[in-house]
């Protein structure tokens, strides 16, 4: 198999002058934006249907997915779907029998304010009567002193006035104590409550009772006045949203489970050192719908009973990260841009050409052929950055060049780090792009999600330290998957090399990988470096590569093909080897595509044919490998 038959220059995916967006418009001003939040959710049709069903049947929902895929938006949308006619106000009353157990009462929305106002008015009326009584006592004493101006009359008068003031003051305090406190006020709400309890501590989530430093002498604050509702109570008849629910302690998750089961939860002081710990109200209604969110790790860290409750009385939904690249879905991205402009309120609308560039970026970030990304928060960041640039330039609309400039200016931290990494390593010749080196290869890796780096890897062969067998020794802060991938490489080497490998120790070093390496996409790079060191054949340094490797010698697909290739371009590398399966995942702009030659491969021998320098040793090596690999029918 010659190099010309292996080499295939990829055709960029629709990176032309125009893109079919499925709708005719000049600017996003013409695009209608739905009023309901549920209609603004893009690409998560399955999740939308579940949310609608859950809202109708009052079921709990667990949303699992990556950040920026619309989990919190779905929670807010659910609150819009809930009815408002069932909303209630919650009041706390003093308990004359036990002041440390205030009474709880629920009334229809808006009646709570009227009840509190009535109690306050009665208290003020009684206050007026007491003032009149005090004035009458003072007037009577003054009259008595005038009629009989003796020392005894004066002293008795002063005593009567002071005693009257003390009695009336105590009566005033008691009347004030009888006024209830409005814990939850839903008056005037046009939609059901939506409470975001992400990261809340115990007092904020479950309710608390404030500490009272004055607990004697009539100076203390009544217990019911110190009761504060928790977020579970504020979400009564609405939605309680908790992102990264696994960050809650197991004790809080257990309390949350109790509240979900009983639909009511008493409020008590959360601190043992506070006087509020002595107060415990009657159970306070908290009939909420829980919308919990998190990533896949969340499932392992959740309280088993809490997850069982959600699964048994609700739904679990996995949020998609991509959607098919269809005309209908492109139309949805146009709507998304219009929504972001309207939601921001400070940036101008986008021209059609600018929206096309956003859609192209969505194609690129999907990382899969025929798909668009659904990590819309990141795309929204580009929309806002482009709008800021257009405002700075004094433009009426955001144009294509503003979007391109925004993508350069608003690079994520990982991309800035990757650019610095490549520049720094090239300056000190850690990354080489010319000539040939034995046992040295330019691998490719990804930092974060969309930032590629060049990863130099070196291998040397030394006589085995053990008489029994040789070892593969790897350094460079590798993760578990990366270590296992290196072990898989040894299977191919043993197969073509035979027993001779037992006489050697093979050392593999990932150069200056202080950030660590994880994943198996460096497998073909390690295999190439080791084989080069064993056979003493130089590797071309103008070639970079990425790909996973099976023990049968097949090159398997990897993630992040496009950012890896872009990193190679920025490093000055001329050729890149990628898995054949990732061929259509590559999405490069025309100016970048012309700077690189891309070689899709299916087997390790195709990798070596491109990466190793020509010579009779290379031809003999390829012959032996093809004879040894089971892919070519060898036993």
UniProtKB/Swiss-Prot annotation:
<dbReference type="GO" id="GO:0006355">
    <property type="term" value="P:regulation of DNA-templated transcription"/>
</dbReference>
<dbReference type="InterPro" id="IPR004663">
    <property type="entry name" value="Lon_arc"/>
</dbReference>
<dbReference type="Pfam" id="PF00158">
    <property type="entry name" value="Sigma54_activat"/>
</dbReference>
<keyword id="KW-0812">Transmembrane</keyword>
<dbReference type="InterPro" id="IPR014721">
    <property type="entry name" value="Ribsml_uS5_D2-typ_fold_subgr"/>
</dbReference>
<keyword id="KW-0547">Nucleotide-binding</keyword>
<keyword id="KW-0067">ATP-binding</keyword>
<keyword id="KW-0645">Protease</keyword>
<dbReference type="GO" id="GO:0005524">
    <property type="term" value="F:ATP binding"/>
</dbReference>
<dbReference type="Pfam" id="PF20436">
    <property type="entry name" value="LonB_AAA-LID"/>
</dbReference>
<keyword id="KW-0378">Hydrolase</keyword>
<protein>
    <recommendedName>
        <fullName>Archaeal Lon protease</fullName>
        <ecNumber>3.4.21.-</ecNumber>
    </recommendedName>
</protein>
<dbReference type="GO" id="GO:0004176">
    <property type="term" value="F:ATP-dependent peptidase activity"/>
</dbReference>
<dbReference type="Pfam" id="PF01078">
    <property type="entry name" value="Mg_chelatase"/>
</dbReference>
<feature type="domain" description="Lon proteolytic">
    <location>
        <begin position="435"/>
        <end position="614"/>
    </location>
</feature>
<dbReference type="GO" id="GO:0030163">
    <property type="term" value="P:protein catabolic process"/>
</dbReference>
<dbReference type="GO" id="GO:0006508">
    <property type="term" value="P:proteolysis"/>
</dbReference>
<dbReference type="GO" id="GO:0005886">
    <property type="term" value="C:plasma membrane"/>
</dbReference>
<dbReference type="Pfam" id="PF05362">
    <property type="entry name" value="Lon_C"/>
</dbReference>
<comment type="function">
    <text>Serine protease that displays ATP-independent proteolytic activity towards peptides and unfolded proteins and ATP-dependent activity for the cleavage of folded proteins.</text>
</comment>
<dbReference type="InterPro" id="IPR020568">
    <property type="entry name" value="Ribosomal_Su5_D2-typ_SF"/>
</dbReference>
<keyword id="KW-1003">Cell membrane</keyword>
<dbReference type="InterPro" id="IPR046843">
    <property type="entry name" value="LonB_AAA-LID"/>
</dbReference>
<dbReference type="InterPro" id="IPR008269">
    <property type="entry name" value="Lon_proteolytic"/>
</dbReference>
<keyword id="KW-0460">Magnesium</keyword>
<dbReference type="GO" id="GO:0004252">
    <property type="term" value="F:serine-type endopeptidase activity"/>
</dbReference>
<comment type="similarity">
    <text>Belongs to the peptidase S16 family. Archaeal LonB subfamily.</text>
</comment>
<keyword id="KW-1133">Transmembrane helix</keyword>
<keyword id="KW-0720">Serine protease</keyword>
<dbReference type="InterPro" id="IPR002078">
    <property type="entry name" value="Sigma_54_int"/>
</dbReference>
<feature type="transmembrane region" description="Helical">
    <location>
        <begin position="153"/>
        <end position="173"/>
    </location>
</feature>
<dbReference type="GO" id="GO:0016887">
    <property type="term" value="F:ATP hydrolysis activity"/>
</dbReference>
<feature type="topological domain" description="Cytoplasmic">
    <location>
        <begin position="1"/>
        <end position="131"/>
    </location>
</feature>
<feature type="active site" description="Nucleophile">
    <location>
        <position position="521"/>
    </location>
</feature>
<dbReference type="InterPro" id="IPR000523">
    <property type="entry name" value="Mg_chelatse_chII-like_cat_dom"/>
</dbReference>
<comment type="subunit">
    <text>Homohexamer. Organized in a ring with a central cavity.</text>
</comment>
<dbReference type="InterPro" id="IPR003593">
    <property type="entry name" value="AAA+_ATPase"/>
</dbReference>
<feature type="transmembrane region" description="Helical">
    <location>
        <begin position="132"/>
        <end position="152"/>
    </location>
</feature>
<keyword id="KW-0472">Membrane</keyword>
<dbReference type="InterPro" id="IPR027065">
    <property type="entry name" value="Lon_Prtase"/>
</dbReference>
<dbReference type="InterPro" id="IPR027417">
    <property type="entry name" value="P-loop_NTPase"/>
</dbReference>
<feature type="active site">
    <location>
        <position position="564"/>
    </location>
</feature>
